[in-house]
Amino acid sequence: MKRRQFLGGMAVAAGVVACAKQEADCSGDGSPAPQSFSWSMVTSWPPKFPGIGVGAESVGTRIEAASGGRIKIKIYAGGELVPAFEVFDAVSRGTVEMGHGAAYYHKGKVDAAQYFTAIPFGMNNLEMNAWLYKGGGLELWRELYEPFDLVPFPAGNTGTQMGGWFNKEINSVDDLKGLKMRIPGIGGEVLRRAGGTPVTLPGSEIFTALQTGAIDATEWIGPYNDIAFGLNKAAKYYYYPGWHEPGPTLECIVHRQAWESLPADLKAIVELACMSTNVEMPADYAHGNAIALEQLKADTSVELRKFPDDVIDRLRSITRDVVAELSARDPAAARIEKSYYAFLDKSAANQRISEQAYLEAR
């Protein structure tokens, strides 16, 4: 274990012990008072931001309310305590007990983590939840994070995203060449191989980068969040579908020592709070996106466009190569890929005669 990880873990342990000691007074009937805990939670999102930001905060507030204050959580938005992309490190070191973000932000540390946010042309929200909760995905996720002293939980999903905002038309595959676009995860590598330049930026920097021309295009989430950022004021063309993020799962991560210090009832509360947010957030997006899309349709400065078929076909083909290469160089990714696609193949067959068939008939 690295020295900073050891010291960070000791900091978490010291906080837990000190808090438990303070609460060890006896209750009125002579029995020990329940232990209480004081945690800090960092996120990758702007403060009070619709959907992801509010959803992340709801995990903390639900835990505190359901525990009757036995777990108090101080919540920090992205950049307030640690940079937006350093949530994983802060929790892994034990600097804080808890974090909320997206697993594909950690690809430089653990490539296979990208499976637990989104794979281009992969699972949607419903399928991700089925795989994680019932198909063995969550067990693989926890196995992957164990060396980092982290316990992950699914804690939100935006639903299928939009393809992004562009300051140039995409009429063919050739139009992707030289395109400088904010796009993370495997989607970014796919764009690079298609001739573009992927850029990773936290949400708070996207508008300025797009408005000033530092980037030519950006994906963010969908109408609900994109209007909140004013992206419709920074670019003209709004493309769909979101091939790169069909059902991105967000994560809540807890430092292992902090997790193991909790009694069984508080562990259940943490798990259920994450699950509650995982259910509510997609509903928030389905509602918010429907309303925001109407606003965008009324905005004459915005053109809503579908990616050409040849562009989608090329991106899908590249995705297969990227995923295969990831598995070839990373045994953990190979195990996860096998489980992921085994379930996706079964689910896709079912979707074609259920959800997909219904939507085509509606």
Describe the predicted segments one by one.
Residues 2-128, 138, 143-362:
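N-terminal secretory/targeting leader peptides
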